[in-house]
Curated annotation (Swiss-Prot):
GO CC aspect terms: cytosol
GO MF terms held by the record: ATP binding; enzyme activator activity; enzyme regulator activity; identical protein binding; small molecule binding
Function, as annotated: P-II indirectly controls the transcription of the glutamine synthetase gene (glnA). P-II prevents NR-II-catalyzed conversion of NR-I to NR-I-phosphate, the transcriptional activator of GlnA. When P-II is uridylylated to P-II-UMP, these events are reversed. When the ratio of Gln to 2-ketoglutarate decreases, P-II is uridylylated to P-II-UMP, which causes the deadenylation of glutamine synthetase by GlnE, so activating the enzyme.
Keyword terms of this UniProt record: Nucleotide-binding, Phosphoprotein, Transcription, Transcription regulation
Quaternary structure annotation from Swiss-Prot or TrEMBL: Homotrimer.
InterPro entries reported for this sequence: N-reg_PII, N-reg_PII-like_a/b, N-reg_PII/ATP_PRibTrfase_C, N-reg_PII_CS, N-reg_PII_urydylation_site
PTM entry text: Uridylylated/deuridylylated by GlnD.
Protein name: Nitrogen regulatory protein P-II 1
Modified residues (O-UMP-tyrosine): 51
PANTHER family documented for this protein: NITROGEN REGULATORY PROTEIN P-II (PTHR30115), NITROGEN REGULATORY PROTEIN P-II HOMOLOG (PTHR30115:SF11)
Lineage of the organism: Bacteria, Pseudomonadati, Pseudomonadota, Gammaproteobacteria, Enterobacterales
GO BP terms in the entry: regulation of fatty acid biosynthetic process; regulation of nitrogen utilization
């Protein structure tokens, strides 16, 4: 099993969620996050004054999937989250040693 963390632009969340549902993903955790990478933030004009915005709003999607659909999920996220502009985000893939569904005690693939 693998855990996929995807940091994407907030306006792409619905597209990514729907596309992942089409490939069989039935659940995910979504968190509003802030961060910066190469784009380093930007300036905004507010009431006539310029302000530097160091951290940009992003959304973090976390899913745990069986090994055989990792590439499909990663490709789906890339295809639907990509705008071609700086700040599209990142995808991280981690090994998962064990998963337990608290309600039933099911483990591993049965728990995801």
């Amino acid at each position: 099993m693998k855990k996929i963390d995807a940091i994407i632009k907030p306006f792409k969340l619905d597209d990514v969620r729907e596309a992942l549902a089409e490939v069989g993903i039935t659940g995910m955790t979504v968190t509003e996050v802030k961060g910066f990478g190469r784009q380093k933030g930007h300036t905004e004009l507010y009431r006539g004054a310029e302000y530097m915005v160091d951290f940009l709003p992003k959304v973090k999607i976390e899913i745990v999937v069986p090994d055989d659909i990792v590439d499909t999920c990663v490709d789906t996220i890339i295809r639907t989250a990509q705008t071609g502009k700086i700040g599209d985000g990142k995808i991280f893939v981690f090994d998962v040693a064990r998963v337990i569904r608290i309600r039933t005690g099911e483990e591993d693939d049965a728990a995801i």
